[in-house]
Amino acid sequence: MKSKGNSTFWCLVGIFLTGALPLFTNYCLNSAEVPYQLVRIENMKDYLSAGIFQMAMPVNWQYEHGTAGLDGNLFWLLPALLRMTGATLESVYRMFLVCIYAVTVCLSCKALAEGFPGKKIALIGTALYCWAPWYLDTLYGRAAIGEALGYAFLPVMLLFLVRAVSRKQGKLPQWLLLAIAVTLLLQSSFAVLEVGMLLLIFCCIYYRRQLLGKEGWLTLGKAVVATLVCNLWFLLPLLRYLVAYRDVARYVGSRPFQEKGAFLLHYLTFFLRGGATYDYKSNGLLDTAAIGVGPALTGLFFFLLWLKFSGVLQKKNSKEDSTAGLFWCGMLGILLSLGSFPWDWLRQNAVFQILTFSMQSPVIFMILAICGLTFMGCGLMKDYRQRKSATEATILEAAVIAVAFVATQFLTNKLLLDRAPLWIRQKEDLPDVVLVEASQFQMSAAAGATQWGAVMISTLGIAGIIIYCIIVRKKDTKQKVRKEAA
C-alpha cells in the first residue's frame, strides 16, 4: 500500500516536471504580459510597505480587455511578501508559477481520483489536464497568470460536481466545498469565474435530479450565503468599482470580440508553437497563441467516435456518472470558443457586454472543452479496460500518455528556444507600464467604516463556518461510535 502511494507521488512529480520545464531557468521568458505581471508584484510590494493592501489589480483600460481590474490580489501576496524579503523579482515570479502549477497537478489529481478510483486512469487524466496547450501557453506564452490561477483551482468545482452527481460525501460538506470553489475562482480571475459558473449551471440543468432536488437547492443556497459572507470584504469594493466604471466596462464589452475566437483547426492541430496574441484576423496563425486541448484528447475523441459507430461501445450514459454531462459541457465550450459563434451580435446587448467585458477572447471557453474531454477520455479508458484485455487497455493508455508527453515537450521546448530572457536587476529595469489606481480596492488603516465593517463580517463568517464544521464533525463522530457500539 505504501509502495502504491509512493508510485502515485512520483508520477505526479513527473507530470509536474514535464509541464514546468520553462521554469527551470534563472530568468523569466519575455512573454506577452510578463512585464505587466512583474510591475504588478513590485507595485503591490511598494503599497504593502506603505501599509496599503490592493485587493485587486490596477488596470490600464487602454488594453484590449478589462479583466485585470476584477482579478483579486489575495494570492499575489505570496510573491509580494517574498519580494519584501529581498528576493529578486524574477525568482519570486518563477516561484509563484511553480506554486500555481503544483496546485494544478494536486487538485486535478484529487478531482479525477474521485471520479475514477483507478489510480492509473486518474494520473493519465491529470497529465492531460495539466499538459493542455491552452494552459501551458497561458502560463508561459501569454503569461495571463489570473487565468492560470483560475484554471488551477477549477478542479475544486469539478470535485464538487463529481461528488454531487455520484451522491458521494467527503470530509467537507458539499455546500462548503462549492463555496470554497467559487471563492478561489473569484480571487483568481473573474473571466474564469464566469466560465466556472457556466459549468455549474450546465451541470445543474443536465443533472437536475441530483443537483436541483430539495437537498440540492439547500446545498446551493448555503453555498451562496457562505460565499457572499466570506467574500463581502472583496465583493463590496468590487460592486463600487463596477458602478464607477460601468460606462467603460460597456465600451470594452462592445469592442470586436468574435474575430479573436479559435478555429476548428486549433482542436485538430497536433504541434503548436507559442505566440502572443489572438489576432487571427490580421495574422492568421502567425505568432498567435498556442491554444488547443492537445493531440491526446483529440485522438481519444475520435477513438470514442470510432467505437460508437462501429458498435463496440454500446454503453448508455448513466445519470449517476459525471462523465456524460461534462462531455456535453465540453462540446458547448468548443462551440462558444469558435470565431464563427455570433459573439459580436450577442454583444450588441448590454447584458452580454457586461458579462463578457472581462474576457479577452472567446478562447477562454476552451477551458470547458479541456475539462469535458479530459473526463471523457478517462471514462473511455476505464470502460475500455473493463471490456478489453489488460494488454489492449495498457497499449491504449501508453499511447495516450506518450502522445501527450511528446506534444508537451515540443511546445515547452519551442517556448524556451524562441523567447528571449527578461532580466530585471534593479527597479529602473522594469518596463514603463502605466497602472491606473483604483481607490475602491485599496485597504488600509484609513479605509472607511463600511469597508472595515465588511472585513469584520467576512472574518466572523469564516470563523463561524469553521466552528460549525468542527461541531458537526464531532457530532457525526459520536453518532458513528454509538452505532458501532450498538
What are these regions (language model features)?
Residues 1-22, 393-402, 462-486:
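Start-transfer (signal-anchor) and selected internal transmembrane alpha helices
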Residues 19-116, 120-153, 184-185, 191:
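Active-site lumenal/periplasmic loops and adjacent helix-entry segments of GT-C-fold
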Residues 41-42, 148-167, 181, 199-200, ...:
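Specific aromatic-rich, kink-prone transmembrane helix
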Residues 85, 135-149, 251-258, 332-372, ...:
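Membrane-helix boundary/interfacial segments in multi-pass membrane proteins
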Residues 160-184, 214-221, 392:
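Short hydrophobic alpha-helices at membrane interfaces in multi-pass membrane enzymes
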Residues 219, 224-309, 333, 418-454:
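Periplasmic/ER-lumenal interhelical loops and adjacent helix-loop junctions
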Residues 229, 291-319, 326-327, 331-332, ...:
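Hydrophobic, aromatic-rich transmembrane alpha-helices
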